Amino acid sequence: MAAAAAAAAAGDSPRRGTPDSDEEDYEEYVPVAKRRAMEAERLRRATKPPTTNAVAVAAPPPPPRSTSSPAVGEVAVKTSLLVKATKLKREAPEVTPAERLLQQEREMIEHLSDRKALMPVGEIAKGISYSEPITTGWRPPLRLRRMPRSRADALRRSWHILVDGDDVPPPSRSFGDLRLPEPILRALRGKGIEKPTPIQVQGLPVALSGRDMIGIAFTGSGKTLVFVLPLIMAALQEEILMPIVPGEGPFGLIVCPSRELARQTHEVIEMFLAPLMEAGYPEIRPLLCIGGVDMRTQMEVVKKGVHIVVATPGRLKDLLSKKKMNLDNCRYLTLDEADRLVDLGFEDDIREVFDHFKAQRQTLLFSATMPEKIQNFAKSALVKPIIVNVGRAGAANLDVIQEVEYVKEEARIIYLLECLQKTPPPVLVFCEHKADVDYIQEFLLLKGVEAVAIHGGKDDEERKDAFKSFKASEKDVLVATDVASKGLDIPDIQHVINYDMPAEIENYVHRIGRTGRRGKTGVATTFINKNQTETTLLDLKQLLIESKQRLPPILADLDDPQEDDKVAIAQQSGVKGCAFCGGLGHRIEACPKQQLQNSVTLARARSDYFGGGGYRGEI
């Protein structure tokens, strides 16, 4: 004790950690509730308006207080994150639920659009980009070139044609104004085609002038002629200027998602080439490049030199990768049913095909269903594109009478026989699964109905013979999966039966579009039951309302709890329905197709992580 007193008397300061130093550093703890109350009082005083008094003299302002240390008796209070967040929330403008959902949709679309451009790898690596479309030798007649813009717009409105793009060529109401060779005009008249349809009125001048194009029109509107005739003219011009040599070509390429559609397009091309050759024009050699056919027969045509190739992605990629054919001179590319081709299933194959192009090309994309997301992605491959739209993308053909029936799953096969009595043959029956196709065909054959079947599990000869006999009216019923739903043109079909409702509404639109073609009226009957999701039924309900069709009671009683929000979002964004798949009954955040693609992408990433083979490559 004496030593400690002596040290204190000598003025020695206490060491750190002693009780005396702890007392000097001590800071009184203020409870959270008290700090919040003090902060609320401070904010109340700060926002309280000053009271005016005519008699009272304003008090002098208090001397400035140092903010570094609080005054004696006061406790330093720091602004908490909760208070800051509350203040920011008060100051932020009020956002409605519809605006919040719209912002979420924009973020999702921006994220989905963040994909590599649909361009050759060589062009991306070298930074090559084209600012102007290619030029062709075709020019419209003088009277069309001098047509006032107001007159052209009035014609488009009368045909319900919507165009988007710069320097859009004027529409042409006659095939004669397009300067097509007389043999082609005779072939058109021989098929009973006297006047162009709305998509042909505007689409043909755009394609003939060399512009990149996205063509959207309902099923059965004549989209095939819009890309076939300009391709024939381009190949004819190339052959006249510089004849093709063995092993060279093609000049033009058409890619289709199915063998049946590719074969049908090839037949249309041959229909126009035959009269041209008879009239003395140079020979134009087309090639059908599809799977299931001996590659040696295809190679014989390639060795002679080929002008036009109609192909499916798989066989085309195979020929290009094996260097059996090249696209060095290809200047014309068409993607038929483009929404399917640039979708997740075929996107990798299409990218590989694009990598084989060596120069600029004219690119045309066509489909009846082209959602906004697909349009935005497809534009990455186009140069100053022109969008020609006849009706809403994904709208049903108004010449089709749509009937929806609630049928229990076990009663569908019996009710199918009753539905076959509605109209005379031919009738097309669609199923989701291959097993159902075989089962229905066998059942109909046992009942004495002449039926044939098509699905992906059958070889090419079986599919070819079945389709040929059905098209020639030798068979009454064709049972098929969705391989027969897109693009196939059988004008005499009067009735389409959906044995089960497809999960994606765009497949439904393509299915029912096999009837009601070329201005004729058709009937589409669809079976629904408890297996369909609410989203699918809402899409179907809105499509029936848009087409002014009768609603069955089960769909009429189906309520959408978010209908008001969807209407508000559609008014603000200008996009009706889902921007991903085109369905009218849901928005993109509830899109089943988008959720399915996310799960597929996640599964791919997981398989890449675990590996596919090799040392410790499989777990």
UniProtKB/Swiss-Prot annotation:
Q: Where is this region: Disordered?
A: 1-72
Which positions, given as ranges, span the membrane? none
Keyword terms, alphabetized: ATP-binding, Helicase, Hydrolase, Metal-binding, Nucleotide-binding, RNA-binding, Zinc, Zinc-finger
Q: GO cellular-component terms in the record?
A: spliceosomal complex
ZnF regions (CCHC-type) run across 576-593
Instruction: Describe the location of the Helicase ATP-binding domain by residue ranges.
Output: 204-388
Which parts of the sequence form the motif Q motif? 173-201
GO BP terms: namely:
mRNA splicing, via spliceosome
**One Gene Ontology molecular-function label:** ATP hydrolysis activity
Q: Which reaction does it catalyse?
A: ATP + H2O = ADP + phosphate + H(+)
Q: What are the residue boundaries of the Helicase C-terminal domain, all occurrences included?
A: 399-559
Low complexity bias: start-end ranges = 1-10, 49-58
Q: Which residues bind ATP?
A: 217-224
Share the domain note from the entry: The Q motif is unique to and characteristic of the DEAD box family of RNA helicases and controls ATP binding and hydrolysis.
PANTHER family, per the entry: ATP-DEPENDENT RNA HELICASE DBP3
Descriptive protein name: DEAD-box ATP-dependent RNA helicase 35B
Organism annotation? Oryza sativa subsp. japonica
